[in-house]
Amino acid sequence: MIYAMSDIHGCIGELQKNMEQVDLGGDNRIVFCGDYIDYGDSSYYVLKYLWDLQKKYGAEKVVVLKGNHEQMFLDWIEDYRNIYSDGTEDCRTFNDWICTDFEYGANTISTFISEQQMDFLNQIARTCSMETISREAVRMILSNHEKLIWWIQQMPLYFETKSQIFVHAGVDEEAGEYWMWGASDNTLLGKFPATKGKFYKTIIAGHVGTCSRDLAADRSYHDVYYDGESHYYIDGSVYKGGKLLLLAYDEENEKYYQVENGRMVLVKPTGI
């Protein structure tokens, strides 16, 4: 059995509940398809949970792919790591990520630092620029979690089997079986809109909510989306009140199931 989850977005309770339904015995394994941070209130704890799980079972059994939110987080850290290390500020600064995080009450940053450190950031935010806040926050995060940040940096962008490609957003399907040779990080992490139709391998991805206009086109739909051809989308918009979806692929009968509340329901083409 191969399990898959994506777009956890800081929702540790939902992750733990889903993992109670995962059997990692035998040859079973699980692939996490990115976007573990932001929006929810437990970003660091989600990453730590996955890191510990991978250390327990090994990287072949627990595959943790990178999402665009992890990459934005890393870009922000790298920019301000450079500023902090050489004392200059004449380089590009990636403020999009931290601005979004502060719009959500600093839900992500606050989980990586102590309460006292967060109080300090809130205090200087009254008079200091976002650049100054970022510089201090990066210094704190690297001091607290340098090994974890290194682990995030090493996350692969896709995982391939004989018949499947697990990825955060998608691949360049126009390239056919040569997709990996021209695959840009932007495509793998941020492809939009979601692709549907026939491909030579099955694509399992997140990134785009299954309720979105490009998929089910139904705001109340938060189950696995299957296009009836080659694509399974598993972002159930958990942080918006949807679901953290758990997909299971039975390698013996080559069928996909949505696992929920202890039941395995065969995934059928959506809307048909």
Regions found by a protein language model. Name each.
Residues M1-I272:
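Feature recognizes metal-dependent phosphohydrolase scaffolds
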